[in-house]
Amino acid sequence: MRALPDRSSALAAIMRGVGRLVRALMREPTGAIGVVLIVALGALAVCAPLLPLKDPLHLYIEHRLEAPGTAFLFGTDQVGRDILSRTIWGARASLSIGLCAVAIGVVLGTGIGLVAGYKAGSWIDEALMKAMEVLASIPLLIWAIALVGITGTDTLHIGPFAVTNETKLVLLIGVLYAPGLARLTYSLARTEVQAEYVAARHLQGVGGARILLSDVLPNIVSPVLVQATLLLGVTIIVEASLSFIGLGVQPPTPSWGAMLSDSRALIFTGDWWVSIFPGAAVFVSVLAFNLVGDAMRTVLDPRRRQRAAETAGGAV
């Protein structure tokens, strides 16, 4: 008798699927460009402490608003901080917040969507999805203002734990991403649980949790990955926007949004480098994740792939 798959085999199946997806992405021109950009940004963010950069917090007062040159490749800001090092270190904040927030949203949203889809038509389904609708009905900015108004921007000390404003931001964004991901997972899971193989698994005596993790989840993970990739680009904009208005990453931690906020008064003074480099970093990051997300849709949707091939053939 064949052994029933356990969680490790389900995880292995998901990882194999992700591996195949990455290989397929590299065969798509836009996907390959996006992957290369993301890898480059990630490498810079991870290796920032090892790179021969100037201190992003040091004030070179005698070099304030110095244009890009050999001493400061990206120039300096109005208080003499090196923009190159601050841009690279800002990638650590933006990418780490994006990855952590999306990870929280995926875990919460996928879990809720799976349970609600499996229990479709029951009170559990109604309660979970109504809660998601209520959560999604209030814009993120309102939640952010309320959170800062209640807790402030300082670090909270809860017992032995220190909750920074960045941590609060990650939790807030992650929780608010859950409704959209839950609705996506719910629609996919509700269709999947009606498949014959799920009924066969029930007849074998397999529990609902095991069916969801071992059978349903691997079959619906691809659209969730596409949505998560697109959300990474959205999160970078959200983090930059909140930091721009003072609700996100707090000084002295380098942040692209805070750098753009600091350079507002210099946009029309000729000191273009102060705002152009953090702005370009936001643009390139969002572009990279959108390219990968769009390529993933093409790879995973046969109809889109066929239309892309027909378009390419017509162009030739």
Language-model region placement:
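Hydrophobic alpha-helical transmembrane segments of membrane transport/permease proteins
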Residues: L4-P5, V36, A40-V79, I245-P254
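C-terminal transmembrane helix and the adjacent membrane-cytosol boundary/short C-terminal tail
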Residues: G152-V163, L176, L225, T229-L230, ...
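N-terminal signal-anchor/first transmembrane alpha helix
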Residues: R2-H58, L128-A131, I220
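Glycine-rich helix-loop "coupling/hinge" segments at transmembrane-helix boundaries
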Residues: L147-T151, F161, L231, I237-V282, ...
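Transmembrane alpha-helix signature in integral membrane proteins
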Residues: I83-V115, S285
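Short helix-to-coil transition segments within interhelical loops
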Residues: T76-R81, Y118-A120, A200-L217, L260
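Generic hydrophobic transmembrane alpha-helix motif, especially the helices
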Residues: L73, Y118, A127-E192, P223
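Transmembrane-helix boundary motif in ABC transporter permease subunits
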Residues: C47-L51, A101-E133, I145
